[in-house]
Amino acid sequence: CRRHGLKFGIYLSPWDRNHPEYGREEYVAYFHNQMRELLTGYGPLFEYWFDGANGGDGWYGGADEKRSIDAKTYYERARRTINELQPGAVIFGGTCADIRWIGNEEGRAGQTNWSMVKGRGDERLNDFTCGESDGDTWLPGECDVSIRPGWFYHPREDHQLKSLSRLIDIYYESVGRNANLLLNFPVDRSG
């Protein structure tokens, strides 16, 4: 990223459907240790991205049950850790976001996209496509899109990468409309 002038961000989902301790204090400690490793091992970080996933049905090491975590406590602790170790990083998602989701995974912001909104509650996420000209809170928008049909690598999709022309359109429909652009590059098993 640095070599090509790109800002580096990381994604670590707080939901682990396979970890046997998910939803328990042992897993919270495990997750925060993973966070610390990522926040201290790769240089300056532009963004830490949460997807808001908070449990549900999962295998959880064989338990095959439904679990979740106390999101407010979980994310507030994460925010403190991120601010301590990477104070310049913005946070996306969870209950502690510095930027807002535009509302689609197509990389397209509203034609008018204000960086202000009224309030910050999760119940307002559906109103965040364009922001609000008379908002009272600075919460700029972020568009997210993958260069592939989905967010993860699948060999059968190798021929379905977005074209350069489509990527340029996405740039104009996101950055050109006052939003940050998160462009996902799913990597294969070799990294």
Language-model features: locations:
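Mature catalytic domains of secreted/periplasmic carbohydrate-active enzymes
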Residues: 2-191
